[in-house]
Amino acid sequence: MRIAVAGATGNIGGRTASFLEAGGHDVVRISRSLGVDLLTGEGLDAALAGADAVVDAISSPPVSPEETLEYFGTTTRNLLAAEQRAGVGHHVLLSIVGIARMDGGTAHYVGKREQERLVEQGAVPWTIVPATQFHDFAGLASSWTERDGVATIAPLLVQPIAPDDIAQVLAEIAAGPPQGRYVDVAGPETQDLVDMARRTNEVLGRQVKLVPTWSGPLDLSMAGNVLLPGENARIAPTTFDQWLAAGAR
């Protein structure tokens, strides 16, 4: 199959593209740095010519909720319109477990909800894949607020998944038929985000004092079980400990 991956130079998109290629598929990498701009549509029609499926694993720059909504809205509309022109038969969207159950969350969550809405209402057959936070999310979250060796971070309850594991799931789904809303995809164990950040920073040699708080980018709308997968979730194999032992990559 010919499968395009949007966000192919990113953390999950790059891994997904590699797994698809390892599976024998013809992969088209879509990224602004590779000459395809989802915001303007430049290069998009040429990139999707002959494509059977598209995986959307793009992320957004760290901006306001309004700007993130505009970014995800524009890029998703452009991508879906180009897919329809090209006759693409399957749009696979990487999303986030729990975002439909909350009104708040980060700016990124606001944008992902808009992506889901556009995909569900669009003309291209689709699969939305809700995943839990990735194993590297805790280290990233602590870096958002770090100042002079001190970082605030919310004590979220999460069930994180290894980046390689979710990329393999996306590659598998992209090679098959559209499935609508897929089951939640998660790692095997629940974790506390503060402890994850502490252990990640230790492995990476970072000296950061962590201060647990809900007064930050991750707020009380994300507390409790809201970010945990449903009972029928697909559970990926790699534990957080195994990911750390492999060098936190």
Segments predicted by a language model, with ranges:
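Mobile cap/lid helix-loop segments that border enzyme active or cofactor-binding sites
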Residues: 195-249
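Glycine-rich Rossmann NAD(P)(H)-binding loop
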Residues: 153-157, 183-190
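Non-catalytic, hydrophobic alpha-helical segments
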Residues: 12, 54, 166-170, 185, ...
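A conserved pocket-lining segment of Rossmann-fold NAD(P)-dependent short-chain dehydrogenase/reductase
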Residues: 126-127, 140-161
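Conserved beta-loop-beta element that borders a ligand/cofactor-binding pocket
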Residues: 87-90, 95-98, 114-137, 144
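NAD(P)H-binding glycine-rich loop region in Rossmannoid oxidoreductase-like domains
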Residues: 22-86, 97-107
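N-terminal Rossmann NAD(P)H-binding glycine-rich loop of SDR-like oxidoreductase domains
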Residues: 1-25
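Glycine/proline-rich active-site loop of Rossmann-fold NAD(P)-dependent oxidoreductases
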Residues: 136-142, 147, 173-183, 206
